[in-house]
């Protein structure tokens, strides 16, 4: 698997859409954007946007050499979660206070890759980090969420979003 430093390196790489004309259609329950980094072409990335009762944005990496997939970052709205209780030496200090924490479905949170654990096993409340979209209260909030998530994963392409018609 990856080290914490490798995961950070991958998140920090500048990424662009493989298909720059792709549109996120919010009337669909799931959208997938395929990304690539011209800084390191050994990897492909994708972003999955799930909008149903639970709203989830996830970015994963595809290592072309080993043909393996690893989740790097995910944001959950309206989904519960339980962080591991065990603290390994690879756990960053900022996550230690959240060991064994149960997230209620009403507590939005960001999952992070941590070396030595299953991918995305650790999460931190959005209220405790500098991510601007803390809650989703109306469909119009989704566009801002997608743009801020793109910024978080260093996606440089413009994203075309088609709003759902209610």
Predicted regions and their residues:
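Detector for Asparagine
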Residues: 4, 19-21, 31, 52, ...
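Acidic, proline/glycine-rich low-complexity IDRs
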Residues: 132-166
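An exposed acidic His-Trp-rich patch
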Residues: 60, 65-123
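Generic intrinsically disordered, low-complexity segments enriched for polar/acidic and small residues
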Residues: 6, 40-42, 74, 100, ...
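Charge-rich, low-complexity N-terminal segments
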Residues: 1-56
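Surface-exposed beta-strand edges and flanking loops
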Residues: 20, 26-28, 37-38, 49-51, ...
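Short amphipathic beta-strand/extended segments with alternating polar/hydrophobic composition
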Residues: 44-49, 69-80, 122-141, 145-146
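Context-gated lysine
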Residues: 8, 15, 28-30, 54, ...
């Amino acid at each position: 698997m990856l080290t914490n430093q490798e995961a950070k390196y991958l998140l920090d790489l500048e990424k662009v859409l493989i298909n720059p004309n792709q549109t996120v259609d919010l009337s669909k329950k799931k959208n997938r954007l395929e990304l690539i980094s011209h800084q390191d072409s050994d990897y492909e990335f994708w972003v999955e946007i799930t909008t149903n009762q639970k709203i989830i944005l996830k970015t994963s990496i595809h290592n072309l050499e080993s043909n393996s997939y690893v989740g790097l970052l995910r944001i959950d709205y309206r989904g519960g979660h339980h962080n591991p209780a065990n603290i390994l030496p690879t756990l960053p200090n900022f996550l230690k206070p959240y060991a064994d924490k149960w997230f209620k479905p009403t507590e939005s949170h960001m999952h992070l890759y941590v070396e030595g654990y299953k991918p995305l096993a650790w999460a931190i409340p959005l209220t405790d980090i500098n991510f601007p979209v803390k809650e989703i209260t109306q469909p119009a909030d989704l566009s801002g969420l997608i743009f801020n998530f793109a910024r978080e994963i260093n996606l440089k392409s413009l994203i075309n979003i088609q709003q759902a018609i209610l």
